[in-house]
Amino acid sequence: FLFSLHCGAQKGQLMSVSVYNQSTAIPFTRFVTTPVHPGFQVAAEFDLNDRPHGRAFTAAHLGYFYHGHLAQGFYVGGDLGYETRTRFGLSFCGMIGVGYLRTYVTQPEYIFQNGSYVRRPDKGNGRLMPSLSLETGYYFKPARRSTQLFVRYQSWGEYPYSPGFIELMSHINLHLGVRFTLGKDTSAE
């Protein structure tokens, strides 16, 4: 109900969809990593302050990644961001965020029980997911809510990862995405 009221007030919902490569790495030490561990993310954005050459916004997102030798994860979270835009369509953006991550192993795990090893059921692990993102993009038209292609470098952590051993596991995601308005946009009218 509240989501529909907010969408109606904006006359079209600003959305982003991205695919990305996920990696366990120290932030800002790598840009492109191999092998590829695929993921995707969908977000709804809500402007807080929209000016001709910049905007402050919040975003609610959900996503998934698959890291074949480690885990697969489902997450939901939010971001606070600021984007600046040039007259010819180039944009730069920074975001800080926090979310909840639920991971599940991708390989069988075993425990020693009653003198033998038995497969352990995976109920998943919940973790806090703080993040910092830098983004550049290009808007195809000068309209405030025109379609945009973007590249985002996101560093994030899993906390607690392995208490008593590795408290925080750092990750990076390299996103390629599109930002667009879903529904009729009459905000310029």
Enumerate the language-model features and the residues they cover.
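Bacterial Sec-dependent N-terminal signal peptides
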Residues: 1-16, 182, 186-189
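Short glycine/proline- and aromatic-enriched beta-strand/turn motifs that initiate or cap beta-hairpins
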Residues: 8-60
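Transmembrane beta-barrel strands of outer-membrane/channel proteins
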Residues: 15-23, 58-64, 78, 94-102, ...
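Sequence/structural signature of outer-membrane beta-barrel proteins
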Residues: 22-28, 47, 51, 62-69, ...
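Solvent-exposed loop/turn segments connecting transmembrane beta-strands
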Residues: 28-39, 52-53, 63-73, 88, ...
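Short connector loops at helix/strand junctions that flank enzyme active sites
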Residues: 37-39, 55-57, 71-77, 87-93, ...
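Outer-membrane beta-barrel transmembrane domain signature
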Residues: 81-189
